[in-house]
Amino acid sequence: MSKSYTLKAEVRERVGKGSSRELRRNGFIPAVIYGDKQPPLAISVPYKEVFYKIHGGGFRTTIATLEIGKEKIQVLPKDYQLDPVRDFPMHVDFLRVSAKSIVHVNIPVHFLNEDTAPGIKRGGVLNIVRHEIECTAPANAIPDAIQIDLSSYSIGDSIHISAVQLPEGVTPVIQDRNFTIATIAAPAGMGDTSEEENNESDAKK
């Protein structure tokens, strides 16, 4: 889990496109805090700090503490909007959380030992079906990533969720099927390895 961080925020007295543009000109981003059965709270947060948090990775899986005057609110970033041309953050949604909160998060998948995987060493290609897995997790123990070790996978193998050891308290949202996360596909022209081996065996008889 990434280390929690603190952002200073201010309550927005005005909302709307005009006030949002003015905030951005002054180095801030409009944002909203919602959840925990409380009314939404319109705030502004520093542009520069949020920009680096978003593009540094782990933004939506890391708890933040928003300091608004003397009040401190624990939140989890749930969504953000980027400028379609310049990739600048335009707006952020924060969810109120506590140590007991269970949240829905999309956790990125990281593949380990790709260079030593038997299937890839033989020319196979890692075909990633899911770059993220939607899970429920304790708000204070969200993993930065779900790690999958490829060192035992060969060409033709599929990696299903049942083969992945998830951290304690983390549960995939999809429960009705053993979904595929990735496969080791044969390179073009190689064909099915098991079929070729059977044909060779038949020829020797």
From Swiss-Prot:
Q: What InterPro entries does the record point to?
A: Rbsml_bL25/Gln-tRNA_synth_N (IPR020056), Ribosomal_bL25/Gln-tRNA_synth (IPR011035), Ribosomal_bL25_b-dom (IPR020057), Ribosomal_bL25_C (IPR037121), Ribosomal_bL25_long (IPR001021), Ribosomal_L25_dom (IPR029751), Ribosomal_uL5_bac-type (IPR020930)
- Answer yes or no on keyword Ribosomal protein: yes
Answer yes or no on keyword Ribosomal protein.
yes
* A single GO molecular function term of this UniProt record: structural constituent of ribosome
Q: Kindly name one Pfam family recorded for this protein.
A: Ribosomal_TL5_C
Question: Which Gene3D superfamilies does the record match to this protein?
Answer: Ribosomal protein L25, beta domain, Ribosomal Protein L25, Chain P
Question: Which CDD domains does the protein's record reference?
Answer: Ribosomal_L25_TL5_CTC
Instruction: Provide the alphabetized UniProt keywords.
Output: Ribonucleoprotein, Ribosomal protein, RNA-binding, rRNA-binding
Stretches assigned to coiled coil? none
Gene Ontology BP annotations: translation
Cellular component annotations (GO), alphabetically ordered: cytosolic large ribosomal subunit
Q: What does this protein do?
A: This is one of the proteins that binds to the 5S RNA in the ribosome where it forms part of the central protuberance.
Database matches in PANTHER family = RIBOSOMAL PROTEIN L25/GLN-TRNA SYNTHETASE, ANTI-CODON-BINDING DOMAIN-CONTAINING PROTEIN (PTHR33284), RIBOSOMAL PROTEIN L25_GLN-TRNA SYNTHETASE, ANTI-CODON-BINDING DOMAIN-CONTAINING PROTEIN (PTHR33284:SF1)
Q: How does it assemble?
A: Part of the 50S ribosomal subunit; part of the 5S rRNA/L5/L18/L25 subcomplex. Contacts the 5S rRNA. Binds to the 5S rRNA independently of L5 and L18.
HAMAP family associated with the record: Ribosomal_bL25_CTC
Q: Family per UniProt?
A: Belongs to the bacterial ribosomal protein bL25 family. CTC subfamily.
The name this protein goes by in its record: Large ribosomal subunit protein bL25
Q: What is the species of this protein?
A: Bartonella bacilliformis (strain ATCC 35685 / KC583 / Herrer 020/F12,63)
